[in-house]
Regions:
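Non-transmembrane, aqueous-exposed alpha-helical and coiled segments at domain scale
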Residues: 1-125
Length: 125
């Protein structure tokens, strides 16, 4: 199982069967609308961003209360873009261990684009 399979609709049933909450919105449509009409660029692509602000936006997209994702830009540690975002189509896996011992597993798909905030990376600038 690979995160990128979810985006293509492959193995979605297998992920759900194993207890992963998948995006309930059309990831590609949100990506296209965000690219055409961006509303949020977030500077700082670390774990706190992925686990909290991106997860909250993911819930808003799942509920239909919002229709665009977030573009994340990293201005310090560019390796996170190259190793944690782009190889996985900007998808993340959020895993929370609850006080009851339950494990909550969610695929976060609200990040639609990941960029290096540095003019030396012309394609991102």
């Amino acid at each position: 199982m690979k995160l990128s399979d979810i985006k293509n609709g492959n193995l979605s049933a297998e992920w759900a069967e194993k207890g992963y909450e998948l995006p309930k919105f059309d990831v590609e449509a949100v990506k296209a609308k965000t690219h055409a009409e961006p509303t949020w660029v977030h500077f700082g692509a670390g774990n706190i961003f992925r686990a909290f602000p991106a997860a909250i936006l993911n819930e808003a997209l799942n509920s239909g209360k919002y229709d665009r994702g977030v573009i994340v830009a990293e201005s310090f540690d560019y390796e996170i873009i190259d190793k944690a975002y782009q190889p996985y189509d900007n998808l993340s896996l959020r895993v929370c261990l609850k006080s009851t011992g339950d494990i909550e597993k969610k695929v976060i798909a609200s990040v639609t684009e990941s960029l290096k905030a540095d003019y030396s990376f012309g394609e991102d600038w």
